[in-house]
Curated annotation (Swiss-Prot):
Gene: Nit2
InterPro entries: C-N_Hydrolase, C-N_Hydrolase_sf, Nit1/2_C-N_Hydrolase
Keyword annotations of the record: Acetylation, Cytoplasm, Hydrolase, Phosphoprotein
Superkingdom in the source lineage: Eukaryota
GO BP: any one term: asparagine metabolic process
Protein name in UniProt: Omega-amidase NIT2
Reactions this protein catalyses: a monoamide of a dicarboxylate + H2O = a dicarboxylate + NH4(+); 2-oxoglutaramate + H2O = 2-oxoglutarate + NH4(+); 2-oxosuccinamate + H2O = oxaloacetate + NH4(+)
Main EC class the enzyme belongs to: hydrolase
Length: 276
């Protein structure tokens, strides 16, 4: 199957977890009704984003939130990329994305590898590492359409991760993410287009909707970029479902026209994973 429909849910996240779960599942069902085959929720979709919130909202996996995601994936017969939630495991907290298949089974669990620790004087200072621990594994899953690679937000800044996913056969990279009003306008679209062109893959980002009253204000603008670096579709800042029909034939044509993946000089340089 050379084409499939991707849906990105730009959810308006509140401080009430049960409301977030109910709304997220409702929008997933709507996306499925509109023909989506793969659906992604945004980063931290079940709780406000912030180091003070992570411990209070953290759950085990499986747990309340992932059980709901499993059920709605099965009900809707879709592949569901569950954005991310704060996960508690063995006394540590992680920023974790769970993916469910059309039968409701857990396909893969991605823990954010690169923690968001930045300090831009006069603009924003944030340290996920105050409460979160980093993941230590690559995360891909297979579908009848293509192999998909996963990252969360800050992971997108690291070109090596995307390159390893491309080496492993991924044709779509999905990054649930919540850039802010400093990094968003500067780097959000730029990074997506760079990862797409560098690796000749589709890149999709699912952001929460913007809430100007939140302690951390998300940039919004969920986006899909094709392997040519063209923005196929981009949301504004409000809650919405973004749809894009992914054409893998176009990906193959681009790789044939500009065969950079075959032209890399392994005799001079390499990017390789140190773990499976």
């Amino acid at each position: 199957m050379s084409t499939f429909r991707l849906a990105l849910i730009q959810l308006q996240v509140s401080s009430i977890k049960s409301d977030n779960l109910t709304r997220a599942c409702s929008l997933v069902r709507e996306a499925a009704k509109q023909g989506a085959n793969i659906v992604s929720l945004p980063e931290c979709f079940n709780s406000p984003y912030g180091t003070t919130y992570f411990p209070d909202y953290a759950e085990k996996i499986p747990g309340e939130s992932t059980q709901k995601l499993s059920e709605v994936a099965k009900e809707s017969s879709i592949y569901l990329i569950g954005g991310s939630i704060p996960e508690e495991d063995a006394g540590k907290l992680y920023n974790t994305c769970s993916v469910f298949g059309p039968d409701g089974s857990l396909l893969v669990k991605h823990r954010k590898i690169h923690l968001f620790d930045i300090d831009v004087p006069g603009k924003i200072t944030f340290q996920e590492s105050k409460t979160l621990s980093p993941g230590d594994s690559f995360s891909t899953f297979d579908t009848p359409y293509c192999k998909v690679g996963l990252g969360i937000c800050y992971d997108m800044r690291f070109a090596e991760l995307a390159q390893i996913y491309a080496q492993r056969g991924c044709q779509l990279l999905v990054y649930p993410g919540a850039f802010n009003l400093t990094t968003g306008p500067a780097h959000w679209e730029l990074l997506q287009r760079a990862r797409a062109v560098d690796n000749q893959v589709y890149v999709a980002t699912a952001s929460p909707a913007r809430d100007d009253k939140a302690s951390y204000v998300a940039w919004g603008h969920s986006t899909v970029v094709d392997p040519w670096g063209q923005v196929l579709t981009k949301a504004g800042t409000e809650e919405t479902i973004l749809y894009s029909d992914i054409d893998l034939k176009k990906l193959a044509e681009i790789r044939q026209q500009i065969p950079i993946l075959k032209q890399k000089r392994a005799d001079l340089y390499t990017v390789e994973s140190k773990k499976p």
